[in-house]
């Protein structure tokens, strides 16, 4: 999936993936897509809930070995 920006949050523990995601989203325009790479298993639930509560769309989420990838479209 095409993204406008990629955020490398691998190796970061909760809550840092969310903190970095929020900061990166603030730099995007509405409709743009942020691709997030994380290794913290808690990021799956955290990013799903954060996306919904923030009015963003979690377009896709995949597990590639130890790396979780998320594509979030800014609302």
UniProtKB/Swiss-Prot annotation:
Database matches in InterPro entries: TusA-like, TusA-like_sf
Domain of life: Bacteria
Family from the record: Belongs to the sulfur carrier protein TusA family.
Organism encoding this protein: Bacillus subtilis (strain 168)
Protein name per the record: Putative sulfur carrier protein YrkI
SUPFAM superfamilies noted in UniProt: SirA-like
CDD domains linked to this entry: SirA_YedF_YeeD
Active site per the UniProt annotation: 14
């Amino acid at each position: 999936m095409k993204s406008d920006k990629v955020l490398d949050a691998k190796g970061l523990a909760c809550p840092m993936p969310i903190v970095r995601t929020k900061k990166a989203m603030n730099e995007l325009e509405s409709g743009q897509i942020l691709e997030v790479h994380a290794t913290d298993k808690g990021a799956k639930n955290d990013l799903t809930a954060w996306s919904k509560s923030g009015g963003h769309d979690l377009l896709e989420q995949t597990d590639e070995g130890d790396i979780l990838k998320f594509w979030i479209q800014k609302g």
